[in-house]
Amino acid sequence: LNSCIKITKNDLILGMEVDFLLIGQGLAGTVLSHRLIQDGHSVHLIDDGDPNSSSKIAAGLYNPVTGRNLVKTWLADILFEEIERFYHEMERLLDKDLVHSLGIYRPFVSYEEQNEWVAKSADPQFNAFIKQVFTQSRNKGVKDPFGGVLLKSTGYINTLELVNGYSEWLRERNLLTKAVLSEKDLVQTKDGNWQFKEILAKKIVFTNGIQARNNTFFNWIPFIPVKGEILTVKQDYYSSEIINRGVFRIDMGEGIGKVGSTYNNSEVNLCPTDAGKKEILDKLEQLIEKEVIAIKDHQVGIRPGIRDRKPVLGKHPSKDNVYLFGGFGAKGVSLVPYLSKQMVKLMVCGEEPHKEVNINRFFKYI
């Protein structure tokens, strides 16, 4: 937007003046705006209301032990102190049931893996997140001949309820505009502020997920959009735990389970595929003994991944009042509550975030 039209403040339509204008009200925009309001700042959000946004499709899992090598997720000890505390706070604000604290049961595929987890259970780095290691099948409808590990400090957040509930909360206070933002709608004033229609903002923050790559401020960030498919299935099966091996299965009650997800960065669109459905069902068959009776829903979302698999927090290199808070991929539920606090410190106090997530690691791409 270097060629933006310059106008004077006197030319503005009389309207709302705010400290921060956030572009996008998915999970990132929801949490960051709440942090800013808590800190005493005025905000306004713009969102297109897309029902297929990744925040609305996401399963919302939080799990401290992830990846093929089953390691503690980055900053797990810090992140997981914040997760349930923050989302319980949002439950109280919105009067919604958002937090589902459930153990995650991961079956072993060999005695070698079983032995590894027995050893990990004695490791102080892991035992805070391990509830129990089973060396035999639990005979609960899960295919686990070698036993498995039951993890704690885990569960899922109902992100659809969170985002929609917070959207309503914002609308009641005239803090949300439903609009598809075009760059020509953002006009920089002579004093450096930003105008969107009748709103004048001191700072703007892009919290719009993968769409941030389409604006000229941040089109140099190496976003990697990833297509993920999720099925809602009917089975004669119930579990009070999330089952996770190859795919996750979250029990929604009455024989309904949410199962996913796929990972596809070569065919990035919102079209459900037979290949994605087959992949999920094949992996579910290897996990759960009961067959699928019916497929109730087949959803697709686009995760906003980054090349180095870490999110991006920071200020534009040449515009002091333009920021990016995004790239959370599949771990937004875990990362956003803690990193949103770092983002507020950056925008308000000038404190730089962790180097692993700092936007300056990508300045070489400009």
Where in this protein do the model-derived segments appear?
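Helix-loop-beta segment of a Rossmann-like dinucleotide-binding subdomain
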Residues: 68, 96-106, 131-169, 179, ...
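Predominantly flavin-linked oxidoreductase catalytic cores and closely associated redox partners
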Residues: 154-237, 241-244
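N-terminal Rossmann-like FAD-binding beta1-loop-alpha1 element of flavoenzymes
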Residues: 20-44
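Glycine-rich FAD pyrophosphate-binding loop
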Residues: 38-56
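Short beta-strand to alpha-helix junction loop
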Residues: 71-79, 149-165, 271-275, 334
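Active-site substrate-recognition segment that forms the wall
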Residues: 31-35, 56, 61, 66, ...
